[in-house]
Amino acid sequence: MSGPILVFDSGIGGLSVMNEIRKQLPLHDYCYLFDNARLPYGNLSEQELITGCVALITHHARRLNASIVVVACNTASTLVLPLLRQQLTIPIVGVVPAIKPAAMLSKKKHIGLLATPGTVKRDYTQALINQFAGNCKVELFGTSDLVLLAEQYVAQQQIDMDKLNEILAPIAASNIDVLVLGCTHFPMIATEISHYLGEGVTLLDSGEAVAKRVRFLLSKESNSNKQLQACYTKDIGQGLKAALVDYGFSDFSLVTITD
């Protein structure tokens, strides 16, 4: 397996996961593929999400001769992993909300999950809660607006602090002591979230666990030229492109399923 690590998301949230993978595997080539034309995924029907994601990921994984696919999107991971594994022979890794470590960490046994509406309502999410947090009270907070705020933040745009406060106010009032960031966009604005919620709430995400899994599946480090390629399904603005350059990207492509 010699091709790049293909990291996929609806937008820039998957960069939070890719950053963790690069800490574990710094010498690999990476392609970051994001389907920003259909952002946010939490508002799509299940069939729209499945059809589009599977077609886009499988096509570009084959085109790139990817060594592994990381679906760095919680909403997509709840739906598309089995179909991807049927169509591709390379390893497929998804992200799972950090319910288990949150339940273990919580002293109050009162935790929260902040995710997209799609992730919050999935049977898969409830199964995780039943399996790993049966001894906890679990509060569910669904939002797509926070995805868009994270996109604006990374693109170096002014974010609507009133909207951010509106989203976080019910969480602050809930008396939880651990909050699971169940969307890969949310770690991008973890500092702002933590500032609002205060020191009494610990934030957890799945990035490090995913990175360890990828490292395990890729048995040896690559000796590549460490190229970072960004592919997107809708043109991006100069602010976001500048942010991606700061992340180390040097190759940019507007793509479709058939490119």
From Swiss-Prot:
Its EC number is 5.1.1.3. InterPro entries: Asp/Glu/hydantoin_racemase, Asp/Glu_race, Asp/Glu_racemase_AS_1, Asp/Glu_racemase_AS_2, Glu_race. Pathway: Cell wall biogenesis; peptidoglycan biosynthesis. Keywords: Cell shape, Cell wall biogenesis/degradation, Isomerase, Peptidoglycan synthesis. Substrate binds at residues 9-10, 41-42, 74-75, 184-185. It catalyses: L-glutamate = D-glutamate. The active site is at residues 73, 183. GO terms for molecular function: glutamate racemase activity. It is an enzyme of class 5 (isomerase). One of its GO terms (biological process) is cell wall organization. HAMAP family: Glu_racemase. Provides the (R)-glutamate required for cell wall biosynthesis. Belongs to the aspartate/glutamate racemases family. This is Glutamate racemase. The lineage of its organism: Bacteria, Pseudomonadati, Pseudomonadota, Gammaproteobacteria, Alteromonadales.
